[in-house]
Every structure is written in C-alpha cells, then in structure tokens.
C-alpha cells in the first residue's frame, strides 16, 4: 500500500515498487493489479501481486468451468462474474481458492522488498 499526498513522490515510489514485480513469462504483462483512489488530499495505491493471470477454473470444461478472471476489484474482494451460472454457483470458499491461486505465496511476498530496494538503488 502506498499512501501519499504528493503525486510526484507517489509516482516515483510507484514506479520503483512496480519494477519489483517481474513481467509474466511472455514479458508482455506485469504480474500485479493496481487499485487507486483519492480521499481528500490523500492518494491511496494498493498493489496486488499475482502469480498468474487466470485461475484453472477459467480453462476447465463442463460444470467445473467458471469464467472468472480476477482483476483489481476482484483481488480487493468485489467478485465480477460475466455469466449468471457462475454467479449462482460461486461460494466463499471458491472465491478464497481463486484469490489464493492467482495471488503469490508468503515466500514470494518476502522477496519483494529486496527487489524493491535493488531497483531503487539503480535509480
């Protein structure tokens, strides 16, 4: 979470933080989601690290398939379903499972500060 009242400082901090998250295997997409908002004079930025873009249930077949591809809002707890059938069958346990699946492990999270400070030292 980045909290700032100065957008210039916020931008600099954000770019350094985002550099700590390597892109996916194809090098096309960074593995994180961002949620940003402003309250009064404060800017809030929440970074959700990702291990993968879509959960296995997205590619499953038959009744196991759920077309849920978590974005920033989903990672923050507002689950978006594009099909009524997915809305009808999703459970709290399934949501937790999907978020855990596309999120990162504790071990991966512990590496982020080191990469952040390495990137910051390069600037």
PLM segments and residue spans:
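HIT superfamily nucleotide-processing domains
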Residues: 1-123
């Amino acid at each position: 979470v980045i909290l700032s009242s100065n957008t210039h400082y916020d931008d600099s901090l954000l770019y350094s933080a985002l550099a700590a998250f390597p892109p996916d295997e194809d090098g096309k997409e960074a593995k994180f989601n961002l949620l940003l908002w402003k309250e009064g004079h404060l800017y809030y930025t929440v970074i959700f690290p990702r291990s993968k873009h879509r959960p296995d249930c997205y590619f499953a077949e038959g009744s196991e398939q759920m077309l849920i591809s978590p974005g920033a809002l989903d990672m923050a707890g507002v689950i978006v379903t594009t099909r009524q059938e997915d809305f009808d069958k999703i459970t709290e346990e399934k949501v937790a499972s999907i978020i855990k699946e596309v999120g990162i492990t504790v071990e991966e999270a512990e590496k982020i500060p080191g990469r952040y400070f390495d990137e910051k030292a390069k600037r």
